[in-house]
Amino acid sequence: MSRTFIWGHRGAGFTGVQNTLSSFRNAIKIGVEGIKTEARLLKGGEVVLCSYQSLKKNGKDVLINELDIEDIKEFKLENGETIPTLREVFTAFKKYDIAYNFDIIDPNAGIKIIEIAEEFNLIDRIEIAKPSIYPHPLPTIFSKIREFNQDVTLVNSIFLKNSIINEKHLELEDMKKLNIQVINVNFNYASYDLFKKVKDEGFKFYIWGILFARSIKNFLSMKYKGEYVDAVFSNLPNRVVKMRDEIQKFN
């Protein structure tokens, strides 16, 4: 039986400055199996890891995709670090058996991630996800990526504004057509019935946003057909890793 896979949100979550090399390093020390982050494609084709849609340049807000790497490296984060590139992250942590999950809003960013991952021989260690704030149908973001690569893991994060998750929100037909392997839901909408439904349909089941001990315990204890929830994301990965190791320690 596989234990639940733990993703550190933007690295070590609420500890330190998110989406930095130091935060990613701290998450690995905590014991996460994967790092969850956001990927943005720059004007020159470089991929950077940050959640910003825009940055200040000459006092004006400029969209990330209109900036180049020189612009990005002039911007300093709160701890003095710069926004990391994907290549910098892959290089920094190449000796670790760590996985990466990237939220994207542009299919071209996903394609570039795949190309860089192949350069580093990490294609089996990456996942590309539709963000939970993305309101459009799955083909708009994943069709182009799936045409480019038939095997990379794709993640359907259910649109956050669906207060009740019905079967239509899962987009099961498109998931099967596009070979999208994972359904990811916010912890507020995760339930045992939904867990069963997703697993019976043949997909992996992820839960994001868990913070509090009670919900962590509930989700890490949940089993269906002898299997735990496949993965969880948290801004408190130290707490989740510790509880996972206690609850699932004999598996």
Feature map (PLM): residue ranges:
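Phosphate-group recognition and catalysis centered on beta-loop-alpha active-site segments
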Residues: M1-N251
